[in-house]
Amino acid sequence: MKILLANPRGFCAGVDRAISIVERALEMYQPPIYVRHEVVHNRFVVEGLKQRGAIFVEELSEVPDDNIVIFSAHGVSQAVRNEAKERQLTVFDATCPLVTKVHMEVARASRRSVEVVLIGHAGHPEVEGTMGQYASEDGGMYLVEKPEDVEKLQVKDPSNLHYVSQTTLSVDETADVIDQLRKVFPEIQGPRKDDICYATQNRQDAVREMAESVDVMIVVGSKNSSNSNRLRELSEKLGTPGFLTDCPEDVQPVWFEGKTKVGVTAGASAPEDLVNQIISRIQALIGGDVEELSGREENMFFEVPRELQVKNI
């Protein structure tokens, strides 16, 4: 049995930054530290931070007065920011800078009353935060997920239209939606550079390159992780069965029956410790040597807020 390890995999710069913000806040200000929504979508990471004193909530109303709250990497709406300001909560913003870039695009369009189409998954916190940047009553903002949604879309002014996308989508599927938008609305404008984040692109490329060489793909990531789900879906689209897991005990022997090569990758919110635990579980079940593949080098780094840089930990 051969176990091939994708590269790049796991943590991206935005996730690294978000986790560091929570860790530094816990160290410098002491527990409890409140975090609005899971700071990143990984059960392993969230449980570790809970044990250190982080309290995860879904609404600001759950945060007591005079406390610290951290916004998750997925971003929040302007309404949430305004509520925190009105309550004079101390806020540390762990929103990924690449998500903030999309927020700025939407806010800029809103100020000019340009209608905006967001490509994304309904209910995802990043989508909720991005939709919440639009305030113009003269324009409008619309959510689409697939090309068929575009055909049903009714806008006020097709000549004054802009699109943005969630940062963790399938590269191929997003391209299909953009193609349909351009077909239905020939004058639509978009970002100069794709909104899909570099880490999402790189991890999908790594799966694309590896899928034909393996018989089954194990994606390390949580079920609520958008980018991890896209990796599993991409593998299956390419003809290689894929399984998503964030717990070694969930890995089943039946996944590997009749297989000789196993591919392992990890979503952008999955830590390397968890990847190693999953690999150990696979080896305990079926044996096998691990070969780490070469891949695109990532050197992106995002600073934590200045207030959290005062003290090294």
From Swiss-Prot:
Protein name in the entry: 4-hydroxy-3-methylbut-2-enyl diphosphate reductase
Q: What residues bind [4Fe-4S] cluster, as annotated?
A: 12, 96, 197
Catalysis performed (reactions): isopentenyl diphosphate + 2 oxidized [2Fe-2S]-[ferredoxin] + H2O = (2E)-4-hydroxy-3-methylbut-2-enyl diphosphate + 2 reduced [2Fe-2S]-[ferredoxin] + 2 H(+); dimethylallyl diphosphate + 2 oxidized [2Fe-2S]-[ferredoxin] + H2O = (2E)-4-hydroxy-3-methylbut-2-enyl diphosphate + 2 reduced [2Fe-2S]-[ferredoxin] + 2 H(+)
InterPro entries in alphabetical order:
LytB/IspH (IPR003451)
Cofactor detail note:
Binds 1 [4Fe-4S] cluster per subunit.
Q: State the similarity comment.
A: Belongs to the IspH family.
Cofactors that this protein relies on: [4Fe-4S] cluster
Q: Which organism is it from?
A: Photobacterium profundum (strain SS9)
What this chain does, per the entry, is described as:
Catalyzes the conversion of 1-hydroxy-2-methyl-2-(E)-butenyl 4-diphosphate (HMBPP) into a mixture of isopentenyl diphosphate (IPP) and dimethylallyl diphosphate (DMAPP). Acts in the terminal step of the DOXP/MEP pathway for isoprenoid precursor biosynthesis.
Q: What class of enzyme is it?
A: oxidoreductase
Q: Which GO terms describe its molecular function?
A: 4 iron, 4 sulfur cluster binding; 4-hydroxy-3-methylbut-2-enyl diphosphate reductase activity; metal ion binding
Instruction: Name the Gene3D superfamilies on file.
Output: 3.40.50.11270, 4-hydroxy-3-methylbut-2-enyl diphosphate reductase, catalytic domain
Instruction: Tell me the residue numbers annotated for binding dimethylallyl diphosphate.
Output: 41, 74, 124, 225-227, 269
The residues the record assigns to binding isopentenyl diphosphate are 41, 74, 124, 225-227, 269
Q: Which residues bind (2E)-4-hydroxy-3-methylbut-2-enyl diphosphate?
A: 41, 74, 124, 167, 225-227, 269
Identify the coding gene. Answer: ispH
Which GO BP terms sit in this record?
dimethylallyl diphosphate biosynthetic process; isopentenyl diphosphate biosynthetic process, methylerythritol 4-phosphate pathway; terpenoid biosynthetic process
